[in-house]
Amino acid sequence: MSRSFGDKAAHSVGVIDEPEIIEIDIEKFEGKIVCVVVASDGVWEFVGNEYIKNIVMKYLREKNAKGCCEEICKKSREFWERSGCAIDDITCVVGYFEYEDSNKNNVIINEISDNGYFNM
């Protein structure tokens, strides 16, 4: 696991302060909608990639990033509550990107956390 700021106590169990970076050439997605999900460990603790993919696909047609974020956070919280553990931070950012051509691209980004939401 990586995070943008180091955590000395967690370093002993493998947490690093070097971010994981992935570069993708969006030109190969011309005419398609791409979705990016960035979430805190409070989301990924119980919710896997396949589960997130199913939620993303549900909101894809309308490019409803806010609805997608809300459902991801809601489901994550439900998993935490069923686990009986204290609830970790739950934060999620979803971006739907529709690549049309090299001169134009549409971006819809919404962020929602367990405390409320922020739209960009």
Positions of the model-derived regions?
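PP2C/PPM-type serine/threonine phosphatase catalytic core
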Residues: 1-120
